[in-house]
Swiss-Prot record:
One of its GO terms (cellular component) is cytoplasm. This is Histidine--tRNA ligase. Pfam families: HGTP_anticodon, tRNA-synt_His. The lineage of its organism: Bacteria, Bacillati, Bacillota, Clostridia, Peptostreptococcales. It comes from Alkaliphilus oremlandii (strain OhILAs). Its EC number is 6.1.1.21. One of its GO terms (biological process) is histidyl-tRNA aminoacylation. Belongs to the class-II aminoacyl-tRNA synthetase family.
């Protein structure tokens, strides 16, 4: 048991880490291009932050959080998402006092106790952006463009942008009355979870994945038809900005998202994975979140996308993730004195900015060359007794097997060759 990771977790091995470096690098490059700066928040937060921010009627808070009491008796939760912690940091450090908007991005592990499946784990990793302090639909469109740009930078095809408006507290309260009236005669046909949602948060019933519930919702009244004037105007503005940026979108009135803080804009990006359509990004506006978390009234909009899901999408579409270059040099030594001299040379090369390694297991020359191939070294440097007597080493180009001799006392020529000059 001790040799197996907990269910729902996954080790990222050295042979796979380059995929993560690539994906994270693209995330960061695109986010910075849009003027977003990185923020890092703790892995755990006070439980109340998520109860107040995410919503105590959500599946995340009711069923999926990793919550425990610390030694001081305080309720602590491993963060299940990144937006509420970003809002907490925005409040704590009084970032609202700066010139707005505040635009931030993060890459973070998040934790949810749910059934593990392809691309989804109990510990997974999320890239997210948050823009606080601007209520204009242009910021919504910018955030959506950022998300689409990430997947376009990956080369992912068949992207579908779906948008909706989930209204504001004012028009949602009126809509909830209409929705409850519609559902009241069908309540017995809904799953237990949706029956519990009926009074507390009926709009989440629309998002239920149960076939029996969906069968009762074929003609359900939609939030889109009950928006107040302000929310309707905001949605119309969003569409204009998306069209101005050349983004094609589909209006999907059934997108409600799984977190209670969303207001007005909600969106998802869909792509095809293993022959099935799957959501690879989701987000929206949350104009009440900062206030609900104890800060001043501040609008916000953002999204989250899973790194594991992104890698899976690339692999499913046959997109090759660039592999990193190998070592500049591997030093092959024969004998104790040669090992010392090789270590001295390797240290000098590393300090000069070159990547390299040497044998540490007293292996045969053949085994050392085999290892040099494994680490994809561009060159090998061979040092044995004969070479030491002459004060030289042999430099071998691993691509064409050409060998030349170099002076050990003066490695200027060696550095020029390794630099490609």
């Amino acid at each position: 048991m001790l040799t197996n990771g907990p269910r729902g977790t996954k080790d990222v091995l050295p042979s796979e880490a380059y995929k993560w470096h690539y994906v994270e690098g693209v995330f960061k490059e695109v986010a910075k291009r849009f003027g977003f700066e990185e923020i890092r928040t703790p892995v755990f937060e006070h439980t109340e932050l998520f109860e107040r921010g995410v919503g105590d009627t959500t599946d995340v808070v009711e069923k999926e959080m990793y919550t425990f009491l610390d030694r001081g008796g305080r309720s602590i939760t491993l963060k299940p998402e990144g937006t509420a912690p970003a809002a907490r940091s925005f409040i704590e450090h009084k970032l609202y006092a700066d010139t707005q908007p505040t635009k931030m991005f993060y890459i973070t592990p998040v934790f949810r106790y749910e059934r593990p499946q392809a691309g989804r784990f109990r510990e997974h990793h999320q890239f997210g952006v948050e823009a606080f302090g601007a209520s204009s639909a242009s910021v919504d469109a910018e955030v959506i463009n950022l998300a689409m740009s990430v997947y376009e930078a990956f080369g992912v095809k068949k992207l579908e942008l779906r948008i909706n408006s989930v209204g504001c507290p004012k028009c949602r309260a009126e809509y909830n009355k209409v929705l409850r009236a519609f559902l009241s005669s069908r309540l017995d046909q809904l799953c237990g979870t949706c029956q519990n949602r009926f009074e507390r948060n009926p709009i989440r019933i629309i998002d239920c994945k149960s076939d029996s519930c969906q069968a009762q919702l074929t003609d359900v009244p939609l939030m889109m038809d009950h928006l107040c004037g302000e929310c309707q105007d905001h949605f119309e503005e969003l569409k204009k900005y998306l069209e101005a940026s050349g983004l094609h979108y589909v209006i999907d009135p059934r997108i409600v998202r799984g977190l209670d803080y969303y207001t007005k804009t909600a969106f998802e990006i869909i792509t095809e994975e293993a022959g099935k359509k799957g959501t690879v990004c989701g987000g929206g506006r949350y104009d009440k979140l900062v206030e609900d978390c104890g800060g001043p009234s501040t609008p916000g909009v953002g999204f989250g996308m899973g790194i594991e899901r992104a890698i899976l999408a690339l692999e499913d579409q046959g997109i090759e993730i660039p592999k990193p270059e190998g070592l500049d040099v591997f030093i092959v030594t024969m004998g104790e004195k040669a090992s010392y001299e090789g270590f001295k040379l390797l240290t000098a090369l590393r300090r000069a900015g070159f990547s390299g390694d040497k044998d540490h297991l007293d292996r045969s020359v053949k085994a050392q060359f085999k290892y040099a191939n494994k680490v994809n070294a561009s060159y090998t440097i061979i040092i044995g007794e004969n070479e030491l007597e002459k004060g030289i080493a042999k430099l071998k180009n691993m691509a064409n097997s050409e060998e030349i001799e170099i002076e050990l006392k003066d490695i200027t020529k060696l550095k020029e060759i390794l630099s490609g000059r």
